[in-house]
Amino acid sequence: MTTELFTTANTVTAHEHIGFELGWDYAHYRLVPPAPYAQEPSPLRNGLLAGQAAFGSRTLAATRPVRKWLQLRLHAWLRGRSVELMQVTPNYLSQLEVSHCPITRTALSTATLDSSDASVDRVRNDAGYAAGNLAVISTKANHAKAGYGFHDALRFVKQIEAGKLGGIDGLSACQWSRVAVLCSYVEPMSHEEASTIPMLVLPPNRLRMFNPVQALQAFISQQLMAPGWSHRAARFEAMLPGKPARRAFLTFFHALLPRVLEASRANGKQHTRWAIEDAWRNPLVLKRWTAFARLLTATQCEELVARANAKKLGALRAQQLPDEAATEGWNLDSRGYVPHAVLMKRSPTSARTGLGEQIPQPVGTQASLPL
C-alpha cells in the first residue's frame, strides 16, 4: 500500500465544498448572501461567482421558502452544522410553518428582528438539520432552549417551581415543560418512562417520534382536532387487545374529552390544539393514560398506530420508518456537525473561470450535494 501525503492547502474539505454549493445555489436563484459573506474571500463567494457566471440571467424564482432554505443553510454552514439536503428542501420547510410558537404560544412574525420571529429549531441538539428533527418555534424559545434537552428542561421546571422564580432564560415553568415534552419525542427512552409524559405540546408536523407510546398518544389526542372523532374513537377501541385495554382506554378518553370540549368550544383550530395540550395538565388524565399505556407494549403501540393509519382512522397521516432510516442524515456520530473529510485534491494546474476563480479538479468521485 502506498501512502501519499499532501497539505490541506491543496485539498477541498467537506465544509469548503458545502460552502461552494451554497454560493452556487444563491446564484441559481439570483440572490446574494448578506454582507460581508458575499464580499469576503471564501468557498461561499467562490461558488457565488461561479454560479453567476454559469447561470447569468437564466435563474429560478426566489420564493419565500427558498429564501428561508438558503438562510438556514447559511446559518448552519457558518457554525459547521450539517444540513441533509435530500429531504430538507424549500417545500419541506414550508410544511413546518405554523402561526404560533408551540412553546410560548405567541403569534409568529417574520423578519422583524423581534423575539417573536419564527426560527427553525433542531429539536435534538446532537443532530444536524435533517428531516424529522426540525420544528418552527419563536426566536425567544429557540435561544432559551439552546443546547438543552428533555432532562435539562425538566430540571428547570422543578427549579422554577421550587424557588418560585418567574422563569429561566425568559421562559416560565409551563413553557419549559413544553420544551421538555418536545425534546422527549426525539430522545429514545423506555416504554415505562415515555408512558408517564403528558402531551403538553402536540408534535409538530413532520417530526419523527422515537417512542411508540408517544406516537399512540399523539394519534389519540389528535382525534379531537377534526370532526368525526367519536366514530373514529369507537373503531379504534375495537382494535384494542382485550377487555382490560378497552376499558382502560374508555376511562382515559372520557377524562380527556370533556376538558377539551369545554375549553375549545367555538374558538377555532388553534385553540382546540391548545385545549388538548392543556387537558394533559390534569393529573387524572395523565394517571388514566399511564394505566392504559402500560397495558400495552411498545410493539403493540406501533402496531396499533400502523393498523389505525391503514384504516384511515387518524386525523393526520402517520408514516412509520425503520430505525436505521429514522436518523438518516442526522450525523449523530459527529453530534450534528459536518464530518471532517477531504473530498478532493486540487490539481497543481487548476482550471480558471473568466472571473479569475480557481475551480478544483476532482480526484476520483466528488461528493455532491443535490440542488
Model-predicted segments: where are they?
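DEDD superfamily 3′-5′ metal-dependent exonuclease/proofreading module
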Residues: 2, 13, 36, 41, ...
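N-terminal alpha-helical interaction blocks
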Residues: 2-70
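Catalytic cores of phosphodiester-bond-cleaving enzymes
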Residues: 24, 28, 47-48, 52-54, ...
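Short, charged surface segments at domain edges that flank catalytic/cofactor-binding sites
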Residues: 54-100
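Generic detector of well-ordered alpha-helical segments enriched in charged/polar residues
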Residues: 71, 75, 90-94, 154-158, ...
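Histidine-centered nuclease catalytic patch
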Residues: 79-93, 99-149
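Polybasic, low-complexity binding patches
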Residues: 123-135, 143-190
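C-terminal, charged low-complexity interaction regions
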Residues: 193-371
